[in-house]
Amino acid sequence: MAVPKKRTSISKKRIRKNIWKRKGYWAALKALSLGKSLSTGNSKGFFVRQTNKS
């Protein structure tokens, strides 16, 4: 099994963790934006089937 030779520095670990967190933040922001556009009816990327409840 592969074992790292040296310990990763705290700063490098923090940088990698922040990059990982930033990816999640942008994914959540994009999902929220898409949800907003779908709810207001401004989405142009795809079609949503409208259901008639009455």
Swiss-Prot record:
InterPro entries for the chain: Ribosomal_bL32 (IPR002677), Ribosomal_bL32_plant/cyanobact (IPR044958), Ribosomal_zn-bd (IPR011332)
Lineage: superkingdom: Eukaryota
Keyword presence, Glycosyltransferase: no
One of the GO biological process terms: translation
GO molecular function, one term: structural constituent of ribosome
Keyword annotations from UniProtKB, A to Z: Chloroplast, Plastid, Ribonucleoprotein, Ribosomal protein
One GO CC annotation: chloroplast
Record Pfam families: Ribosomal_L32p (PF01783)
Cellular compartments annotated: Plastid, Chloroplast
HAMAP family on file: Ribosomal_bL32
UniProt family annotation: Belongs to the bacterial ribosomal protein bL32 family.
PANTHER family assigned: 50S RIBOSOMAL PROTEIN L32, CHLOROPLASTIC (PTHR36083), LARGE RIBOSOMAL SUBUNIT PROTEIN BL32C (PTHR36083:SF1)
Annotated protein name in UniProt: Large ribosomal subunit protein bL32c
Lineage: Eukaryota, Viridiplantae, Streptophyta, Embryophyta, Tracheophyta
Gene that encodes the chain: rpl32
